């Protein structure tokens, strides 16, 4: 079964992949960690292949899974972005978590050891029915075990708290806090002006972080562009709201400025951290599920958009 991606999923993954340092403050906030931002982030492939009962190969796609390496210690994390809660979410979490664990499982002396990731969910919308915390409980022949799935609700964070805690990752989704008032803003210029002034404050604060050297030009442009992408989708029925906020946020920044910066060489470790991790995961998973060498090479080329020669290099590095 495949789940349809939303523009919000795309924004979430873009922020994770292109501005990976922004995830560190979220990890600290949700899991109570004390990462400094100097740690290494190594991404795992989002695609996980599973053998189904009918003999077909199934594929599941997570929003993101990665390791944070601090010195000699490392922890695995799995994050999902949800516009709202649904009844199948915990089932998907367990399915993803176990597959992530199996991808790096070890068998020693007839004992299989797997490590489940630290999992969490970011809710973009919330109401009284939205859980504050979730838990997965597993009843095994050896006893019952459980683990928590922490919940982060973006609508609970105001602008001051976002900037005080460095939760810049949440800025593109901040517009969800105003969603219930779109109709009011759309028909009242004064109220719309208040919203515009709030977003002017956001852009000014982002600019201050840039000038202070706390974020890069590329990160700034990505935050602005992803904010516009969310806005265009969520406010598509309210033209005044959409155009009013876009006017303050600066339009399609990423189409030229940030891409130019990226093409000039500011990759921020993407190739080292993401492509290497994805290649290793695709090869190792393919071998585990019994794919042929050709099938694994094909997946490397398609998933990573690389040449056959590069795929062969990855296969020889991470294969049998």
Identify the role of each PLM range.
Residues 1-169, 174:
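Accessory alpha/beta interaction modules
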Residues 67-83, 105-108, 152, 186-320:
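Short, charged alpha-helical interaction segments and adjacent helix-coil junctions
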Residues 163-191:
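Coupling/switch segment of ABC-type P-loop NTPase heads
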């Amino acid at each position: 079964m495949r789940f349809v991606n939303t523009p919000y999923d795309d924004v979430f993954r873009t922020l994770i992949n292109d501005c990976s340092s922004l995830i560190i403050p979220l990890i600290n906030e949700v899991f109570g960690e004390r990462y400094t931002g100097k740690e290494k982030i190594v991404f795992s492939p989002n695609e996980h292949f599973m053998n189904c009962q009918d003999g077909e190969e199934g594929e599941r796609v997570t929003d993101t899974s990665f390791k944070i390496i601090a010195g000699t210690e490392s922890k695995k994390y799995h994050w999902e972005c949800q516009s709202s809660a649904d009844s199948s979410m915990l089932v998907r979490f367990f399915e993803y978590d176990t597959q992530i664990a199996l991808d790096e499982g070890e068998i020693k002396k007839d004992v299989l050891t797997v490590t489940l990731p630290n999992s969490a969910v970011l809710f973009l919308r919330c109401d009284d029915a939205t859980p504050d915390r979730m838990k997965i409980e597993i009843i095994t022949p050896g006893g019952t075990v459980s683990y928590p799935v922490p919940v982060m609700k973006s609508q609970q964070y105001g602008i001051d708290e976002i900037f005080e805690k460095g939760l810049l990752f949440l800025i593109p989704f901040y517009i969800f806090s105003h969603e219930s008032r779109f109709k009011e803003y759309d028909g009242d210029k004064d109220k719309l002006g208040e919203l515009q002034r709030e977003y002017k404050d956001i852009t000014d604060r982002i600019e201050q972080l840039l000038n202070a050297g706390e974020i890069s030009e590329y990160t700034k442009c990505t935050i602005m562009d992803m904010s516009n992408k969310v806005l265009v989708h969520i406010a598509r029925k309210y033209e005044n709201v959409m155009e009013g906020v876009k006017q303050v946020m600066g339009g399609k920044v990423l189409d030229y400025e940030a891409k130019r910066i990226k093409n000039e060489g500011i990759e921020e470790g993407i190739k080292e951290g993401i492509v290497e991790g994805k290649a290793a995961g695709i090869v190792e998973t393919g071998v585990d599920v019994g794919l042929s060498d050709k099938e694994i090479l094909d997946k490397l080329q398609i998933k990573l958009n690389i040449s056959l020669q590069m795929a062969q290099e990855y296969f020889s590095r991470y294969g049998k």
